[in-house]
UniProtKB/Swiss-Prot annotation:
This is Transcription factor Ken. Residues 188-276, 331-365, 471-491 are annotated as: Disordered. Disruption phenotype: Flies show low mating success and reduced copulation duration. Men and female genitalia often remain inside the body, and genitalia and analia are missing in some homozygous flies. These flies are named after the famous dolls who also lack these 'features'. The lineage of its organism: Eukaryota, Metazoa, Ecdysozoa, Arthropoda, Hexapoda. It comes from the Eukaryota. Residues 223-234 have a biased composition (Polar residues).
Amino acid sequence: MKEFQRMLMLQYSKHGECILKEIGAAFRGEHPADLTIVCENKVKLHAHKLVLAAASPLIRNLLEDTHLSDCSTTVYFPDVNATYFKFLLDFLYSGQTCITSRDVNYLHDLLLLLQIKSDSWKTTDSAYLSSKCGGLRDRADRRKQQYTSPQNLEPDQTLKYEVDSVDESRNAADFSSAFNSNDNCESAAECERSGGHNNKEEDEDDCTHKDNKSDKDTDEIVNLSNAPPSGTSGSNSNISTSSNHQQQQHHHHHHHNHNNNNNNNNNNSSSSTINPVNLSLDLRTKSENSASRTLGSGSDHSGIDLAVTASESTKRKGLFFDSHKDVMKPLSDGSDINSSPENYVVTPHRKRRPGFHNTQSDNQPFTSYPHSLLEELRLAKSTTSPISGFGSEKNMLAHLEDGALNGDTLTPDRKHLLEAQRNRAQSPEIPMHLGPQFVYQWQSNQNAAMSAMPNLQSRLSSLSHISLNLDHPEGRSGSASGSGANLAGSNTHASSVREYRCEYCGKQFGMSWNLKTHLRVHTGEKPFACRLCVAMFKQKAHLLKHLCSVHRNVITTTNGADTENRYSCCFCSMCFESVQELVRHLSGHHNNLLLTKNLRE
């Protein structure tokens, strides 16, 4: 019969971690670089083909097209500044980089040059978008100086624009053209109020068009402080009157947060060119797109402010850092630690040995039993006392003596039993003669003093043996002594003394063969051997288990595909239906063949 080799699946659980460590080691210069990049002014940067080819399709195509025998390859980028390429290498090797907001556009252009898709990265700071919208901010300042004056400008009114789903590849001219689409309105706030449902529908269409265009968008908020709240043009005079009530509502809504908004907006406008931007590899989910469309399609943008961004940042930090209250909170007590599911210790089940199907509860622990003479005397008195032997029967007849039951309802047998119990004569005291086997042989050192006590035999012999009878002294004495013997036997079994003690470790055993098997642990004796592979074992059960597992192909007999397997003996021609029957056969008929001393026969 042809045997097919089994296929094994090998899995390396730390594969990803090792790859990241190797990439970090390559970035630190521990591995020799095989790719040289020549940037502007002939500045050379060293990198690795594996990392750049995995990130940039352009580099991968160049390496595939040029089959060079040389180990090192040089790629020229004469129009790329080396500083930005260093930022890109840091970004590709470590997964994130920190740059100023003014360099985002150059880094983005470099990513586009290397054909790295921009939908796999996003920014965590809105300052770079404010720098890209510098033309928009300058235009708003010019419109403020042209159409407003210090007399009609209220200090607590701010204008907030929300640029939703803005593409990073768009330049400042795109924002200027988008702003020029509303030139029919003199003021941006008037445009928001006068647009009505038409502007809302146009904004929704624009957002839908931008979201369907690509997934490369990021949601950013641009705050322009001290912008004109209303216009002075005559073409919009009829609209300003009708929207006066709406303007008051907006003023009331922004009244509580105008100080914080002004401060944050001034800080953003003043430090927009020096704030660092953290670029991290992160895929944008569809839920963020839906949330941005929901926020961008509404006509009232007053509820979107920096507090929302701060709360979201706090929530994100809460996922990774514990609060100070939780850190300083002490443990209540030890019960919480012990009762937690993580502290449960799972012990494996003991494997069943072939032929020995004893349960875990049958194995009593090896604990020494402290014996005392007083307990033995108390036990002997309780087993021979008439009260203990027939206490239950006397309690059963107690309510009859008190007259709880009517005498007419008793049967003749019960009446006879009651009279015999009431008029029972005192049994004569007969001295009990104890044989030498009744006296315990004290083996332990702690009971040596008790075994040396004088008159121990006379004290035990002084106990009286009382014959208990109800009807006939001769007939009931046998049953009483039998019940007393049963009680004594059960109590003796419950408090059995482990008389066999190991001289190496001090463990005590109740059976001699248990001690004999235990001594093999210390002596190293292996009296059982396998005749098929000459393996030796300390216990016969271990040898039988070895035969049924390692040499299973030897003892298994196959008669066909439709019939069940049979188990044949390796020492004779007998076959069995189950492994248990074979184990009993080997342990009984061929017990001598399992011994090490008979291995040469």
